[in-house]
């Protein structure tokens, strides 16, 4: 029997920001977990709360204006929320590494990349100057930078965007963190370089056996890198499941919308891509009931009155939608989504259990 060890567990996390316009409820009761060696992708539109969630784990949210309303962030069983800034400095980099969105601004332009990598080592390990430089060269080689002995002495402006992102990944891995948070690491890169970085991250995970939280708005990216997916909308997780469950048995209308709006290689080029109507809600005054109801063509009366609970579809698949209630009418997802579901119909065993969970 394989023993799965839980690395991270986020319980009922709620984070708000105080602004002149009122309290912005950026995260509203988020729950998820991550096991050792696993990759979890958190997906959603801009403003859904993905980056705030990742920054909360690292405790990088500026306070004020941000503050934790409630919840726990358990890393190896220890709650990070009450830790002081000094205590968190021993966690950041050493236990949890982070790759930020834009490699162009993540590096100090006046400092050689080798020195920026060795700074991480000096902070978290007792290591000599020579050993640190050797380790920096090894890390650059690990992330696929050619001639690392030479390039370790170069400045960021001497690297392309893709190579800079590789340097940022090397910095994040320098102290061998148990968890790596990648916050849209391919957003600022062109498509071919994106593919290389994604391939690199898959390769690195096999080599160093780290757990990864991958933040993205691109479902196409998710299919390549993740084991499980959490779909976020308006500060809440509305659906979570394995990659196959999210792509080939999605149950939430928002997930349907994301999948239907995604182009595929099978597209003839003649059909129009589906767009999700409307805009995300204003979280200074979150809507009553289901936050997605105003944008959903499947919304029922109860969606505007009561917030839906989580419904369990399988041991790994949970959905926050009244459509899964036994009394709800049976509805069909958009044709573009049904086509994807048919594609894997023979290999994917559909769960039959649907019940409400606490």
Curated annotation (Swiss-Prot):
One example GO MF annotation: ATP binding
Origin: domain of life: Bacteria
Phenotypic effect of disruption: Inactivation of the gene results in a sporulation-defective phenotype. Disruption confers resistance to bialaphos.
The keyword DNA damage is assigned to this record: no
Cellular component annotations (GO), alphabetically ordered: plasma membrane
Sorted UniProt keywords: ATP-binding, Cell membrane, Competence, Membrane, Nucleotide-binding, Peptide transport, Protein transport, Sporulation, Translocase, Transport
Topology in membrane: Peripheral membrane protein
Catalytic activity, EC: 7.4.2.6
Subcellular location: Cell membrane
ABC transporter domain segment(s): 8-259
Matches recorded under SUPFAM superfamilies: P-loop containing nucleoside triphosphate hydrolases
Residues where ATP binds: 44-51
This protein's record includes keyword Membrane: yes
Expression induction or repression: Positively regulated by TnrA under nitrogen-limited conditions.
Catalytic activity entry: a [peptide](out) + ATP + H2O = a [peptide](in) + ADP + phosphate + H(+)
Main location class: membrane
GO biological process terms, semicolon-separated: establishment of competence for transformation; peptide transport; protein transport; sporulation resulting in formation of a cellular spore; transmembrane transport
UniProt-listed PANTHER family: DIPEPTIDE TRANSPORT ATP-BINDING PROTEIN DPPD, OLIGOPEPTIDE TRANSPORT ATP-BINDING PROTEIN APPD
Reported function: Part of the ABC transporter complex OppABCDF involved in the uptake of oligopeptides. Probably responsible for energy coupling to the transport system. Required for sporulation and genetic competence.
Assembly and oligomerization: The complex is composed of two ATP-binding proteins (OppD and OppF), two transmembrane proteins (OppB and OppC) and a solute-binding protein (OppA).
Annotated family: Belongs to the ABC transporter superfamily.
Full protein name: Oligopeptide transport ATP-binding protein OppD
Organism listed in the record: Bacillus subtilis (strain 168)
Gene from which the chain derives: oppD
